[in-house]
UniProtKB/Swiss-Prot annotation:
InterPro entries: Hfq (IPR005001), LSM_dom_sf (IPR010920), Sm (IPR047575). Belongs to the Hfq family. This is RNA-binding protein Hfq. The gene is hfq. Residues 66-86 are annotated as: Disordered. The lineage of its organism: Bacteria, Pseudomonadati, Pseudomonadota, Gammaproteobacteria, Pseudomonadales. It comes from Ectopseudomonas mendocina (strain ymp).
Amino acid sequence: MSKGHSLQDPYLNTLRKERVPVSIYLVNGIKLQGQIESFDQFVILLKNTVSQMVYKHAISTVVPSRPVRLPSAGDSEQADAEPGNA
């Protein structure tokens, strides 16, 4: 994993795993809404009533509908399950 993806991939993966609804703003101002179904180095698959493949180079901002907690390097799955860590 390259240094550029050290924050992006865990962030997108948390949004995907927790099925957090997101608003994605494109560089041309268009707002897309849905849940992140999948992603790779170049695209995000956004699911709403239909699935849309959105190229990352066209994305300006990803806004989750609620706050998300990113796992840090020392976190374990057990720590995420404890009350008060949400």
